[in-house]
A protein has these predicted regions:
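Propeptide-to-catalytic entry region of secreted or membrane-anchored zinc metalloproteases
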Residues: 1-89
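Solvent-exposed, flexible loop/coil residues
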Residues: 7, 71, 111, 115, ...
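Generic structural hydrophobic/aromatic packing signal, biased to beta-strands
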Residues: 15, 43-45, 95, 126, ...
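Acidic glycine-/aspartate-rich tracts in secreted/extracellular proteins
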Residues: 17-23, 48-50, 100-103, 130-132, ...
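Intrinsically disordered, low-complexity boundary segments flanking structured domains
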Residues: 24-35, 77-85, 107-116, 184-195
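Sequence-level motif detector for i,i+2 pairs with an aromatic at +2
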Residues: 38-40, 90, 120-121, 198
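Active-site-proximal segment of zinc-dependent metalloprotease catalytic domains
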Residues: 73-160
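The catalytic-center signature of Zn2+-dependent metalloproteases
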Residues: 136-198
Length: 198
């Protein structure tokens, strides 16, 4: 589970390209719809805790259960991790790497408008092996972080709240040019997946 600084920096590069409108190809297809949203990312610092052998973690400040058992969405353990490890959430994006017991790839605890900026609730949890070069293929390209940071910045799923009137500005992800979807899509993209008819 140990993540190198070079993999962290590679993840920051993926985030910067994704939110900067990079139109490079992905699996041979050019992303001509990419938009520069004006967000840039820089690696600031990382606190490394030896979790290469989770059963033998000896860092007293970090309970060994935090890497697996406690690292789950909405749990007391999640709150304990954030409260203990967060660095000034009003100035930094805190990213917590762990191995969630429920198989989650990542999550955010809250959208940006739900708590004051200084609240430790703000931050992103990621399965450590989803970073570029990790073992979670095909989810090891850094795109899970892009997805979760999108939520951190206030973007909803296109299926958020189900399928409503196509012309309802609050439907789906509340972005007018993406149609709301009735359900989540896992796997291959399905164009217009369960969209509401106009």
């Amino acid at each position: 589970g140990l993540v190198s600084e070079s993999r962290l920096r590679a993840q920051v590069d993926v985030l910067t390209r994704a939110f900067g409108g990079d139109t490079s190809t992905y699996e041979g297809v050019a992303d001509t719809d990419a938009a520069n949203v004006g967000a840039t990312f820089a690696f600031h610092d990382a606190t490394f805790h030896d979790v290469s052998d989770v059963s033998d973690v000896s860092t007293p400040a970090v309970p060994r259960a935090w890497f697996r058992e406690a690292c789950a969405p909405g749990t007391t353990g999640e709150r304990e991790i954030r409260d203990a490890l967060a660095v000034d959430p009003s100035s930094f994006l805190n990213v917590y790497l762990c191995e969630p017991p429920d198989g989650a790839l990542g999550w955010v605890a809250a959208f940006p408008d739900e708590f004051p900026e200084s609240d430790t609730t703000h931050g992103v949890f990621l399965l450590h092996s989803t970073l570029p070069g990790g073992a979670a293929a095909p989810y090891n390209l850094g795109d899970t972080a892009v997805h979760e940071v999108g939520h951190f910045l206030g973007l909803y799923h296109t299926f958020q709240g189900g399928c409503h009137d196509l012309w309802d500005a609050d439907a789906g992800d509340a972005v007018f040019d993406t149609p709301p979807h009735a359900r989540a899509n896992h796997g291959a993209c399905e164009e217009m997946l369960g969209t509401t008819s106009s």
